[in-house]
Amino acid sequence: MLLAGAIFILTIVLVIWQPKGLGIGWSATLGAVLALASGVIHIADIPVVWNIVWNATATFIAVIIISLLLDESGFFEWAALHVSRWGNGRGRLLFTYIVLLGAAVAALFANDGAALILTPIVIAMLLALGFSKSTTLAFVMAAGFISDTASLPLIVSNLVNIVSADFFKLGFTEYASVMVPVDIAAIIATLVMLHLFFRKDIPPTYELARLKEPAKAIKDPATFRTGWVVLLLLLVGFFVLEPMGIPVSAIAAVGAAVLFAVAKKGHGINTGKVLRGAPWQIVIFSLGMYLVIYGLRNAGLTDYLSDVLNELADKGLWAATLGTGFLTALLSSIMNNMPTVLIGALSIDGSTATGVIKEAMIYANVIGCDLGPKITPIGSLATLLWLHVLSQKNMTITWGYYFRTGIVMTLPVLFVTLAALALRLSVTL
């Protein structure tokens, strides 16, 4: 147990710290090699772990490539400018619409896409409107927060969702039928908390005339138009083809390939830059990190957590839902959500929970790992990258400020979201 734990801690430190620019994939690989060399894991564990991660990572990469291509075409800036006009010069309405745009982008393009793509666009738009630094910070924090809290509804909305759905063999429609209503509750709770927390920083009015026409944001009309078609077909494909046994990754890959072909033909987008910007290291990272996690499982860590979950299960649906969600949220905030989701899944699988109680734990694990990372900067890799992007835009958010904001914002939203899950599973739709 001690050796497996030491290897895990070393791996997490390297992944978060990234000394001398060491990629997350290589840090995780080092951890996996150490685990294999020390006997913490075995050769036979590699295909088992690969079976857990391949579909998730392939889907994630395809979705991010689609989002990068659409970003280069001007799709997201066009959308942001439109919702800004819907605000009709009223600051609170603009704030609400930006948050709802972030929720929509997170649902369709994953939380990473929402945070990293929308943030620079929102900053540029707010600068054009002449907003103060405190107002800009409020909007940026809101965009970053909603990208995670609203990444629940679809399997493709978060890498955590894909990993968990693959592990427990959850179908796309089955997952969405539970989590779409839960996500709506999360969005409402997030909106309320954001308006309360940043109420003094949101201006009463803004000048619409300062914003450029949305049409001027479109840089590649062909890719822009094709993007709408691809998104529609992807959603249809996810709901129709996935139940037939076609992997979500294959459906997403076809969509990415079609959009990429259109973008390459148009010459308006540097497709090579897009490919280089795709998160290829996530494949190596997921395999390496999850091999390290499997070492913790082999050492018996997940057995301890299974015992805790068994006690929660004995207390009923609400205790199982809230207990699992808050436990995995805490673990995610301390040791990152990617390792936590697999630890949670293995622990749930090893518990004696059955029926709706086990189902509640599965979805609560996802919620905890999606929302928990908002408590601390190290909760997710996307947050660390997001903070880096902000620093490049001369917006430095200290870890202390992030934690103070995160803890106040996250806990109420997490409670409401988990309560919505318990209510959803209490009724048969």
Curated annotation (Swiss-Prot):
It holds the Pfam family ArsB. Its main location: membrane. It is a multi-pass membrane protein. The lineage of its organism: Bacteria, Pseudomonadati, Pseudomonadota, Gammaproteobacteria, Enterobacterales. InterPro entries: Arsenical_pump_ArsB. It comes from Escherichia coli. This is Arsenical pump membrane protein. Involved in arsenical resistance. Thought to form the channel of an arsenite pump. PANTHER family: TRANSPORTER ARSB-RELATED (PTHR43302:SF5). The gene is arsB. Keywords: Arsenical resistance, Cell inner membrane, Cell membrane, Membrane, Plasmid, Transmembrane, Transmembrane helix. It comes from the Bacteria.
